[in-house]
Amino acid sequence: IPIEFAPQIPYHGVEDLRFTPGWGDSTSNEYWTYSFLWYLDGKPETSSEIIEKNLQLYYTGLIGRNIEKRKIPADRILTPKTSFKEVKASAGDVKTFGGTIYMLDYIEQKPITLNCVIHLKNCAASENKTFIFYEISPKPLTDGIWQQLDNLNTSFNCSKSD
């Protein structure tokens, strides 16, 4: 970080992505299901508004880098819309956010809504670092896939990240 396709996001650090095996298979229950971690320098302010803005920039850039490669017609391109709110903090979180990302599924070239849970974490062993863990899937939050995503979050040990 900065992220190549979204340099306007004003953070410095490392991004780590984890894709489910069926992430890119539209017939799979795991389609578009993945998680990523931002291991950031400093303690940037984090609010639902900041998350909305950053993810709007992130997915605009992600889609933009796929337009030419996937030959997406101009009439199918739509601006991503994000909506987030702070929810009850999950165990081990400083803050937890929930929301949605409405965007172009550039694989199938049609609109998709991704549900998202975001975990903001601090770590005593990493005094001037911030961890933001994103869980993402188009499946409803009641689907079993979310347990798999949350297992990544609950098994995360920030003291091993330094």
Which residues does each predicted region cover?
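Short glycine/proline-enriched turns and hinge-like loops at secondary-structure junctions
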Residues: H12, E30, K110-I112
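Conserved polar/disulfide-associated segments of primarily extracytoplasmic proteins
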Residues: G22-Y106
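Hydrophobic side chains in beta-strands
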Residues: P7, P21, W38-L40, Y134-E135
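Generic structural hydrophobic/aromatic packing signal, biased to beta-strands
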Residues: I1, F19, Y58, C116-I118, ...
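Short, well-structured beta-strand
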Residues: S90-D162
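Proline-anchored loop/turn motifs at beta-strand termini and strand-loop-strand connectors
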Residues: I1-E15
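A structural "domain/chain start" motif
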Residues: Y11-T27
